[in-house]
Swiss-Prot record:
Subunit details: Occurs as a monomer, dimer or trimer. The dimer may be the active form.
Gene Ontology cellular component annotations, sorted alphabetically: extracellular region
High-level lineage: Eukaryota, Viridiplantae, Streptophyta, Embryophyta, Tracheophyta
Protein name: Bowman-Birk type proteinase inhibitor
Site (Reactive bond for chymotrypsin): F51, S52
PTM note: Binds calcium, probably through His-3 to His-6.
Taxonomic superkingdom: Eukaryota
UniProt cross-references to SUPFAM superfamilies, sorted A to Z: Bowman-Birk inhibitor, BBI
pH note: Stable at acidic pHs. Inhibitory activity is unaffected after 1 hour at pH 3.0 and 96 degrees Celsius. Inactivated after 1 hour at pH 10.7 and 96 degrees Celsius.
Length: 80
C-alpha cells in the first residue's frame, strides 16, 4: 500500500488561501461562523480530525464571516 495520495494538481493551491465548503453561522450579533468540514487544517488554528480514512477535519475556529467554498466554480455532479 503506497502512500502516494497527492491529487492536488487539478485544483488551485489549497494551501495558499483559506476556504470552507460547509460553513455554519449562529444568529447572534456578531455571528459566529464555523467551518463544518475540511479535508485539511491549513488555515485553521484549532482543528479536530477524525481517524477515518480519509480523515475528515473539523475546524473549530470561530469567525464572524465565512470563507468562500473550496470547490472550484464548475459543478461536478456525482450522479453518474
Amino acid at each position: 500500500s503506497g502512500h502516494h495520495h497527492h491529487d492536488s494538481s487539478d485544483e488551485p493551491s489549497e494551501s495558499s488561501k483559506a476556504c470552507c465548503d460547509h460553513c455554519a453561522c449562529t444568529k447572534s450579533i456578531p455571528p459566529q461562523c464555523r467551518c463544518a468540514l475540511r479535508l485539511n487544517c491549513n488555515h485553521c488554528r484549532s482543528c479536530i480530525c477524525t481517524f477515518s480514512i480519509p480523515a475528515q477535519c473539523v475546524c473549530t475556529d470561530t469567525n464572524d464571516f465565512c470563507y468562500e467554498p473550496c470547490k472550484s466554480g464548475h459543478d461536478d455532479d456525482d450522479s453518474g
